[in-house]
Design a protein with these regions (language model features):
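Conserved catalytic core of the tyrosine transesterase superfamily
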Residues: 2-18, 22-31, 38, 52-327, ...
């Protein structure tokens, strides 16, 4: 709980706070708490009052964060968090003042409001025809083929395959449980019931399609890990033991009197081969682990030659943009490239607004749109 730097005591409406907590996701609550703590810390250091904040304080705070490198999208979130805490405390919202709106608009004008996009993980990579073209560049198929057949490899193959099929966000992906997978009309495919997502805080639920590829990967992982219920994607602890060479037993007369006497020193020891032990956890993976898993899979695929048209410099550049969201962006672009309409894409990825799917397709649309097609023809 954050103790805000207030000008005077504020009466808290406990019922309102409880209702907001019940209606919000844990991620949203953590984000609000983090944003308000940062704002309160800045106010204390600069002799300002956190609540009720003045429009001048909010505008100056946004300016300060912009000077520290915060992106316009982040500044918009900070503004929304400050507004929310004032609403929850039933005091005047300073972010509605024209000064705050104009200051934020000026920052966006200066820095640009284009939001950095996760590098897409498309199934065949940056291809024009998702059905006929051969895979190239960074592609999901290459990553899947490069997975090892040990427990971490089996889990990662299933994890990436499901992530691409469904376009789930990291928090939604790690929340998948065995019980959420149900039969489909196609006997080789399955359906995934999504009980709650970022855009479905009321828990109405949704359904996503799991390809036969994903079904096979899930079956291999759950059989090897002995998972029958509960979280599907779990942490795998790996313990590796080095090999030890055989040791001959020592003759008694070679043992110095200054050594501690131990008859076992006279016994030979057999060679011990290297071995690896795995321990599959009971709980689900943390959402923050998904991005690092994708990057580790990319490095492995590159080392195995599965991304043969990439150089080491290409790899370093690509890794910088890969995040847990890359599979969602990649699926979005593949759907556009395959000719699906916006309504179908919004339904498949459970979008409520067309803004984000269109933003994710911005670069692809420029190349494959009308102007791009014409220029490609005329050179």
């Amino acid at each position: 709980m954050t103790k805000l730097n207030c000008r005077s005591p504020i009466t808290i409406n406990a019922e309102l706070i409880a209702a907001y907590q019940a209606a919000s996701s844990p991620h949203s609550l953590r984000a609000l708490a983090s944003d308000i703590e940062a704002f309160d810390h800045w106010c204390r250091r600069n002799g300002r009052v956190t609540s009720p904040a003045t429009p001048e304080t909010v505008a100056d705070y946004l300016d300060a964060r912009a000077g520290q490198g915060a992106k316009p999208a982040s500044l918009g979130r900070y503004k929304a968090s400050i507004a929310k805490i004032h609403q929850l405390l039933d005091i005047k919202d300073p972010t509605q003042a024209e000064l705050v709106k104009l200051r934020l608009r000026a920052i966006r004008r200066e820095k640009g409001s284009t939001q950095a996009q996760a590098r897409p993980l498309r199934f065949k990579g940056p291809v024009r025809n998702v059905e006929r073209d051969a895979p190239r560049g960074l592609n999901v198929r290459g990553l899947l083929e490069a997975c090892a057949d040990d427990l971490p490899g089996l889990r990662n193959r299933a994890l990436l395959s499901v992530a691409y099929d469904t376009g789930l966000r990291a928090s939604e992906l790690v929340a998948v449980e065995v019980e959420h997978i149900v039969d489909a009309i196609d006997p080789e495919a399955r359906l995934l019931t999504i009980s709650r997502s970022k855009g479905d805080q009321e828990g109405k639920g949704a359904t996503a399609f799991l390809s036969p590829r994903s079904v096979r990967a899930i079956a291999a992982w759950t059989a090897a890990a002995d998972i029958e219920e509960g979280p599907l994607f779990r942490r795998v602890q790996v313990r590796r033991y080095k090999a030890r060479a055989a040791v001959k037993g020592r003759r008694i007369e070679t043992i110095s009197g200054r050594e501690s006497w131990d008859l076992r020193k006279t016994l030979p020891k057999s060679a011990v081969p290297a071995r690896t032990e795995y321990d599959v956890g009971e709980g689900a993976l943390h959402p923050g682990s998904i991005g690092p898993i994708w990057r580790a899979m990319i490095r492995r695929a590159f080392d195995k030659g599965a991304l043969s048209d990439l150089t080491a410099d290409d790899l370093a550049q690509l890794l910088k943009g890969v995040s847990a969201h890359s599979t969602r962006v990649g699926l979005n672009q593949d759907l556009f490239a395959s000719g699906e309409d916006l309504a179908g894409i919004m339904d498949a990825l459970r979008w409520k607004s067309p803004r984000m799917p269109l933003a994710y397709n911005r670069n692809l649309a420029a190349e494959q749109g009308a102007a791009g097609r014409l220029i490609a023809k005329i050179g």
